[in-house]
From Swiss-Prot:
Protein family (similarity comment): Belongs to the alpha-IPM synthase/homocitrate synthase family. LeuA type 1 subfamily.
Protein name: 2-isopropylmalate synthase
SUPFAM superfamilies xref list: 2-isopropylmalate synthase LeuA, allosteric (dimerisation) domain, Aldolase
Positions that bind Mn(2+): D14, H202, H204, N239
Record's subunit section: Homodimer.
Organism superkingdom: Bacteria
Subcellular location: Cytoplasm
Enzyme Commission numbers on file: 2.3.3.13
Stretches assigned to coiled coil: none
Organism from which the protein derives: Variovorax paradoxus (strain S110)
Gene name in the database record: leuA
Keywords: Amino-acid biosynthesis, Branched-chain amino acid biosynthesis, Cytoplasm, Leucine biosynthesis, Manganese, Metal-binding, Transferase
């Protein structure tokens, strides 16, 4: 008889706290639908009280997600909790996740509250939340660095008040696997009513041990929920990686003895979607989802894999969604083949009209490059979905002129709220000239803090995927653009970032 391990994904909340990872409502909705296809148990959709934008995103996700539980974060006060409950009204299954810091450092320096005041506020918050929804999660922020006696007292109280999940975060990534696992075990043994709640772990990766700590919390501590993000996305060094913890539990079922609801064949599609949406490129040697995760360069290894895959592979690439063949389509491919490939990649589009529009973009791309890879398809689908969103700025065309020894000239045509405009400029290279051409009309005043180019596939005619990170008035956003022409991709990425600067609202800080 095995136990069930609940996977709680917080890509849309804690993951979004990475500088530049801010997502629009429509982007969050697309990722939420992918998480539902992945069969994630709980989707933490955002922090409704932090901004009107986050409230609307959580509300929209609650309305469209039918299989997964949709969770909203709140601080331990009536206003935040009420706001979360309001956003979750349309959810088939809704959860309020409320938190307050319990470590001496946080209580004294941040909250300026006594332990008794924190205890009382936690009690009242869970009581209030439990009157609004049946599923309430409580987190003692910086729980791992809290006094065990005080923490046990708080956790016993909130369980008595109706908390159904107790999440113990290692907020600053300070824990060591064995110590963290024993810490969870100690809490479960010392809290008299611990059996009345599901115990959860939430680990940050500051020392590179978020996955190891989470697994120790499960194996040693007896936790039955893991909080994680796609690609390990998160502020500072990131969070526990969903794909790594899931595949560890699945691959080593002999050791963990746990069941999962996750459909692992959608992992790679989810990873690519999050990467392309946020602009956070997945490193090639990233476990499970990196481009080299199933690559073998050593002749000895290659020989072994050809003879028997299990000589050097502990899991199958196709089990996590990697395609067996990379080159799948070309300019002679028809709409049905394109649609079939979308289904194989785990991509679901809203309507036949959207598929038709994406297919037209595919045919345009196929006229420009002979081999179309899965990565190309995902990039153009992502671009098509973005083009359907009401945006202030949209790319139309670009022309440039450059000769050796002279400053390049660029002219960029784009729309501003549907009206076509033209910007022209010279620059210290074609990319610089093109972005200055856009700025000559927009005059955003934003500072570029990152510019990076990633080849989507491995040939010289590959599409370039450009990430641009802009900072303005304390806000940081990423824009992503893809095109076989790097200069065009750069202009698209810059306009994408400008759109996010226009739409992003200020937010209240959440827990780490």
């Amino acid at each position: 008889m095995t136990d069930q391990l609940i996977i709680f994904d917080t890509t849309l909340r804690d993951g979004e706290q990475s500088p530049g990872a801010s997502m629009t409502r429509d982007e969050k909705m697309r990722i939420a639908k992918q998480l539902e296809r992945l069969k994630v148990d709980v989707i933490e959709a955002g922090f409704p009280a932090s901004s009107n934008g986050d409230f609307e995103a959580v509300k929209a996700i609650a309305d469209i997600i039918k299989e997964s539980t949709v969770c909203g974060l709140s601080r331990a006060n009536d206003r935040d909790i009420s706001r979360a409950a309001e956003a979750l009204k349309g959810a088939a299954r809704g959860r309020i996740h409320t938190f307050i810091a319990t470590s001496p450092l946080h209580m004294e320096k941040k909250l300026r509250m006594s332990p008794d005041e924190v205890h009382e506020q936690a009690k009242l918050a869970v009581r209030f939340a439990r009157n609004l929804v049946s599923d309430v999660e409580f987190s003692p922020e910086d729980g791992y660095r809290s006094d065990p006696d005080f923490l046990c007292r708080v956790l016993e109280t909130v369980i008595n008040e109706g908390a159904t999940t107790i999440n113990v975060p290692d907020t600053v990534g300070y824990a060591i696997p064995e110590l963290y696992g024993n810490f969870i075990k100690m809490l479960r043994e010392r809290v008299p009513n611990s059996d009345k709640a599901i115990w959860s772990v939430h680990c940050h990766n500051d020392l590179g041990m978020a996955v190891a700590n989470s697994l120790a919390g499960v194996k040693i501590g007896g936790a039955r929920q893991v909080e994680c993000t796609i690609n390990g996305l998160g502020e500072r060094a990131g969070n526990c990686s969903l794909e790594e913890v899931v595949m560890a539990v699945k691959t080593r079922r002999d050791y963990f003895g746990l069941d999962l609801n996750i459909d692992t064949t959608h992992i790679v599609a989810a990873s690519r979607m999050v990467s392309q949406t946020t602009g956070f490129v997945v490193q090639p040697n990233k476990a499970v989802v990196g481009a080299n995760a199933f690559a073998h360069a050593s002749g000895i290894h290659q020989d072994g894999v050809l003879k028997a895959r299990d000589t050097y592979e502990i899991m199958r690439a196709e089990d996590v969604g990697w395609a067996a063949n990379k080159i799948v389509l070309g300019k002679l491919s028809g709409r049905n083949a394109f649609k079939q490939r979308l289904q194989e990649l785990g991509v679901t589009m809203a309507s036949e009209a959207d598929i038709n529009a994406a297919f037209l973009r595919f045919k345009e791309l196929a006229d420009r490059k002979s081999e179309i890879f899965d990565e190309d398809i995902l990039a153009l689908v992502s671009a098509e979905e973005h083009s359907n969103v009401d945006e202030q700025f949209a790319f139309v065309s670009l022309s440039q002129h450059s000769e050796t020894g002279e400053r390049p000239q660029a002219k960029v045509v784009f729309t501003v709220q549907g009206k076509e405009v033209t910007g022209e400029s010279d620059g210290n290279g074609p990319v610089d000239a093109s972005l200055k051409a856009i700025e000559s009309h927009v005059k955003s005043g934003a500072e570029m803090v990152l510019y990076s180019v990633n080849a989507i596939s491995g040939s010289t005619e590959s599409q370039g995927e450009v990430t641009v990170r802009l900072q303005n008035a304390g806000r940081v956003v990423n824009g992503v653009g893809a095109d076989p022409d790097i200069v065009v991709a750069s202009a698209k990425a810059y306009l994408s970032a400008l759109n996010k600067l226009q739409s992003q609202a200020e937010k209240v800080a959440a827990q780490g």
